[in-house]
Amino acid sequence: MSNPELLIEPVSSPGILAAKLLLPFGSADDPAGTRGAHDLLASLLSRGCGRHNHVDLADLVEGCGAGLRCDAQEDALVLSLRCTVEDAQQLLPLLAQMVRSPRLEPGQVALERSLTIQALQRQREDPFHCATTGWRQLTYGNGGYGHDPMGIAEELGHLDREALLPLAERLPTASSVLALAGSVPPQIIDTIGSLEDFRDWPEGSGNDRSGRRPYAEAVGTETIQLEAMDTEQVVLMLGQATLGHGHPDELALRLLQCHLGVGMSSLLFQRLREDHGVAYDVAAHFPALAGPAPFVLMASSVEERSELALDLLLNIWDELSEQPLSEAALELARAKYIGQLAQGLQTCSQRAERRVQLKAQGLPDDHDQRCVQALAELTPTDVLHAAQRWLREPRLSLCGTSAALKQLERRWDRRDAA
């Protein structure tokens, strides 16, 4: 069975099987004017497929005590099944049916569209979400990474079954990956390719992005985005678009992320919370994406201390490309990196998802092990040079009261003028 490509990840488990089917179409591929289309499609794939309407499908899955869902990420749709080994034979074909024969019933389309719009409206009340949305638009413009996978409420309102059909019809045509993790019976491996719903799957056309929507498009020259909100806190997001998963410099930036944002010993936590007490929450965000991933420092502060919080964030950002980490700090970052890897591979589902992610992005199965082996060779100077290549042109997104935003904008303008 060449499509989907089958990967097996044996894990000792009490008769549990996790399956992940990755399709290389995510929210970055939302057509212009229909942002949120792939997320809406993802929510509908588990609302009826093949011979099963939404009620029959729910009864079948829940009657087995199993879980079935589909999630839209920036780079892919990921179908997930978790069940017992005994039920795998009858439930695994559902993954193929969701891809090859989704029902997309008009009533379910209207329901899921309404639920998504309601969720987006609730998110508008969250200052963190507003700051994140502003930063995406500032950095990626109208490109594929310029919006939350859930989309834009105003554009979702126009989506119907006819708009989703072309997206659904192309799902089986690209090279997809199916990973099974847990207690995988040999007979499943031997027979899955002959199961009715997996037979005669179209040959994958490859995952070449030529002709597809760019990750960033129509990005302006502005370096600051302001989102006014009547709130008691100010959210600050400082960062820039960097590189894709598997890039030679990624490991160095991943160590910087661990140094900055992992645990109470992290630099952001120590500097902003412990030393100065200016932040409620701090984080360093650097997701593993196929395209230029955001490397973002985040903090929330009270209005009275928000300018100091911004000053501290700017100082930390500048230090990344001006002075190398100490050997002790780098060694701690290495330990955190290894710990983060281990935490991300604790369950069968996590292991299966990691396998399909690596395969879909053209990385070897032992990519993580290679990174761990390469840690010892990375020096503070190597990390400094990577920061100098990728972290020199940050953009700032703010959400807070109008008075706070004006004050912080003046502070940012002074930096730009310097």
Predicted regions located by residue number:
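Active-site-flanking structural segment that lines cofactor/substrate pockets
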Residues: 28-29, 54
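Charge-rich, well-structured scaffold segments of protease-associated domains
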Residues: 56-209, 215, 243-244, 275-418
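Active-site SXXK
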Residues: 37-47
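His/Glu-based metal-binding/catalytic segments typifying zinc-dependent metallopeptidases
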Residues: 7-27, 35, 177, 202-269
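Short, Gly/Pro- and small/polar-rich lid/capping loops
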Residues: 1-2
